[in-house]
Every structure is written in structure tokens, then in C-alpha cells.
Curated annotation (Swiss-Prot):
Component of ribonuclease P, a ribonucleoprotein complex that generates mature tRNA molecules by cleaving their 5'-ends. The gene is POP4. GO terms for biological process: rRNA processing; tRNA 5'-leader removal. This is Ribonuclease P protein subunit p29. Belongs to the eukaryotic/archaeal RNase P protein component 1 family. SUPFAM superfamilies: Rof/RNase P subunit-like (SSF101744). Keywords: Nucleus, Phosphoprotein, tRNA processing. It comes from Bos taurus (Bovine). Its main location: nucleus. GO terms for molecular function: ribonuclease P activity; ribonuclease P RNA binding. The keyword Cell wall biogenesis/degradation does not apply.
Length: 220
């Protein structure tokens, strides 16, 4: 294939194309002159070394490996978590005594949050802190409700969603109490805080940035 592509012009072709044959000496002289012009700082000996080599690499480019984009693993959606029942508390785990240590941790968390609960601590300050605090582990009681069966229910808060509290009672019964139309109390070290569920329909993570009014309607 190479012999077909590269071959010398015949005399007839050279005449028609006006191409003159250059001898080996003229070709060598041309290469030497070209190298000298291209690399003027190189010595004659170095040029001779270049000419003695079989091949001269003019340029070389390394092929950059394309970095594979790592796909970020997406977490489960809320719908998928519900379908997998990840939030469900198993019946064998629905025991009040099992969550008493959680309640003790919650009390210490609130004491640290309020810089210590002292008798002279302002109740308004505690109320403001509790409204934005994480209530998981608190003992919550229903004091008022439009549904009489909810009144008097007391237990440790295990789960909080936007619209309900899930609490475990001393009788080891898991109760789901809607926030709407209910008033709750939270007690710690003698301080009692009231939570109006109708105004408390927020997720636990959203309450930390919520500005609650000091005074508002208390209708169920």
C-alpha cells in the first residue's frame, strides 16, 4: 500500500507538473539548513546527532483520561421511607421503661439550653426556648381537646410530625395525638409550658427558625 501511495514521479509527470528532481545531497543540505534555522542555539554536533537518529518526535500529547463523574447517591424520599415503614415503632419496642433514659437526656438538654433552670428563671424565657427546642423525649400531656378521649393522655414524646405527636404512655400504649384542636403541657423541674397545637403545626426542624408571637389566640 505504501508503494502505491508514495512513488517517484516519472519524467513525463515531473515535466507536466513542473517538478524538479532533487538529489540526495540537495535534500540533505536542505534538512541541515532547516535545522540550523529552526534551532540556532544548537551546536553543529547536536544537529548531527539529530540527523543520525532514525526518527525525531516533534510533538507528543498525552491523552487526558476523562474523570468519571461520580453520581451522588440520592437518599430515600419521604414517600419511600413511609412505604418501607422506617418510622414505625415495632410492638416489642413500645415500652415506656425503654424510653426513660431518653427522657433524662431531654431534661439535661433543656437545662443546658436554658443555662440552668433556677427558681428565679423567667417563665417567658423557658416558654420561648421550649417552643423552638427538640421535644423528643419530653413528657407531654393533653390538657384540652375538642375530642374528650384525648384529654389526660400523658407519655413520652417519641415522634413529632407536622400534624401529630406520637407518645408512649405508662401503660405501654402508643398514642397518636393530632396537634389540631389540642392544648398540651410540658413540665420540667417544676416549670410548666403550654403548647397550643393549632399554632404548632410545624416540623421539629422548622420550629427553630419560626418566630412565635408572644400573645396570640388560644382558641382550640
Amino acid at each position: 500500500m505504501t508503494s502505491v501511495v508514495y512513488h517517484a514521479f516519472s519524467q513525463k509527470e515531473a515535466k507536466e507538473l513542473d517538478v524538479q528532481h532533487s538529489g540526495a545531497q540537495r535534500a540533505e543540505a536542505f534538512v541541515r539548513a532547516f535545522l540550523k534555522r529552526s534551532m540556532p542555539r544548537m551546536s553543529q554536533q547536536a544537529l548531527e546527532d539529530h540527523l543520525q537518529r532514525k526518527a525525531v518526535v516533534l510533538e507528543y500529547f498525552t491523552h487526558r483520561k476523562q474523570k468519571e463523574k461520580r453520581k451522588k447517591s440520592k437518599g430515600l424520599s419521604a414517600k419511600q421511607r413511609r412505604e418501607l415503614r422506617l418510622f414505625d415503632i415495632k410492638p416489642e419496642q413500645q415500652r415506656y421503661s425503654l424510653f426513660l433514659p431518653l427522657h433524662e437526656l431531654w431534661k439535661q438538654y433543656i437545662r443546658d439550653l436554658c443555662n440552668g433552670l433556677k427558681p428565679d428563671t423567667q417563665p417567658q424565657m423557658i416558654q420561648a426556648k421550649l417552643l423552638k427546642a427538640d421535644l423528643h423525649g419530653a413528657i407531654v400531656s393533653v390538657t384540652k381537646s375538642k375530642c374528650p378521649s384525648y384529654v389526660g393522655v400523658t407519655g413520652i414524646l417519641l415522634q413529632e410530625t407536622k400534624h401529630v405527636f406520637k407518645i408512649i404512655t405508662k401503660e405501654d400504649r402508643l398514642k397518636v395525638i393530632p396537634k389540631l384542636n389540642c392544648v398540651f403541657t410540658v413540665e420540667i423541674d417544676g416549670f410548666i409550658s403550654y403548647i397550643y397545637g393549632s399554632k404548632f403545626q410545624l416540623r421539629s426542624s422548622e420550629r427553630s427558625a419560626k418566630k412565635f408571637k408572644a400573645k396570640g389566640t388560644i382558641d382550640l
